[in-house]
Curated annotation (Swiss-Prot):
Gene Ontology CC annotations of this record: membrane
Source species taxonomy: Eukaryota, Viridiplantae, Streptophyta, Embryophyta, Tracheophyta
Protein name: Cytochrome P450 71A19
EC number(s) given by UniProt: 1.14.-.-
Organism: Arabidopsis thaliana
Annotated TM spans: 3-23
Compartments where found: Membrane
Keyword vocabulary terms for this entry: Heme, Iron, Membrane, Metal-binding, Monooxygenase, Oxidoreductase, Transmembrane, Transmembrane helix
Amino acid sequence: MEIILVTLCLTTLLALLLLKSILKRTTTNNLNLPPSPWRLPVIGNLHQLSLNTHRSLRSLSLRYGPLMLLHFGRTPVLIVSSADVAHDILKTYDVICANRPKTKVIDKILRGGRDVAFAPYGEYWKQMKSICIQNLLSNKMVRSYKKIREDEIKLMIEKVENASSCSPPSPVNLSQLFMTLTNDIICRAALGRKYSSKEDGIDVENIVRAFSALVGEFPIGEYIPSLSWIDKIRGQDHKMEEVDKRFDEFLERVVKEHEDANKDTRSDLVDTLLTIQSDKSALKLIIWDMFLAGTATSLSFLEWAMTELMRNPKVMKKLQEEIRSSSRQGLFVTEKEAEKMDYLQAVIKEALRLRPPAPLMVPRVFSEDVTLKGYNIPAGTQVIINAWAIQRDTTTWGIDAEEFRPERHLDSILDFQGQDFKFIPFGSGKRICPGIGFTSALIGVTLANIVKRFNWRMDVEPQRVQHDLTEATGLVVFRKFPLIAIPSSA
């Protein structure tokens, strides 16, 4: 009897959910909505997403078009996969869709979006962004960190030299090396000193990776509250609590050190923020944004750029020939020298095109009803722009769009400042990544020096090369497996 009763209840519940879904679809049938794959009751199109969401969204867009409507649970989500549609959204409707959708991760770790990247569009966001740019990310401030960048790159080169001088040369974990480099530079620039797990007991590097992974996930409970128990079983809630705890402990320590320091020696971002921002919670979140802007994107680029160079030895050789002939033998390649190297700049652009650090731009949400390409888009619809798909679009980039070919940029004036919508590795519009200048200043000079001083080969068997290219899940996409390579002195 009990089994029959339970079965009857479940059947009734499913029938009601199905009826509700049908009624909702009937009301939206009066609107001219973008093409959409058939969705299941309750979960919508969530079952069609893979761990590498940018790849599954691109596959769907090839079938349903560059402007496609999906449903994550009951939440309508517009997927944009062409430069043409991205232009309309980021130019015509930039302000209307400048807000961010709220998520559990943002509410929990970022205190409802009190930072810059995820704050609601408005006066608070404008003020916080202005503070960050003026005190850390402006062109003037980025230039002032030149000595810090040079010091840390030279330390990195020393570590590689020690490995290459062994007989035989020792393998180098380039992923770890680049993480330490970018972390130490942003720590010195923004916080006044380095922080490391060895000396301070603070593993900033893994906090950055863990946070990026959390923000890039699509938890079931986010879109279907009644199924939030699944997230607990999968350990997502525990991971969020753990990241929040480690995140807050680190930032609390940073702020306290600066509060206790000699007030006459103020010189870094935290000191400046303490004088103008009384809200300690907001202050800590701004500091965290700088880590994401300055560390995660640079690390992702360097990992994938070196991966592609080692997979394409002809490109590596051509790049090394340019660098070695354009700078004095044995000496450090300066930032000015790197900026004038045409093929190096082409390699940077091609790596950003094929492997954008954030394949999916951070979601936005429409605050008003709009008409886009003849389709009705209701207010409340979320927008995800697939930069990864746009930058591999064969109609824009040619039939070799999947290939790593820097030569395509040599006769082009295309840049990555967000003005040309076929190439938006750092986003565009009002929400463009504020760390673009900081990252640009670091990646070129780092790549130039590590490629000039050493010859490189992957420490992996030929049959495992494809496995070695697996991507991690996250807002910023790193390699899933560390990039291990063997250096030899040039």
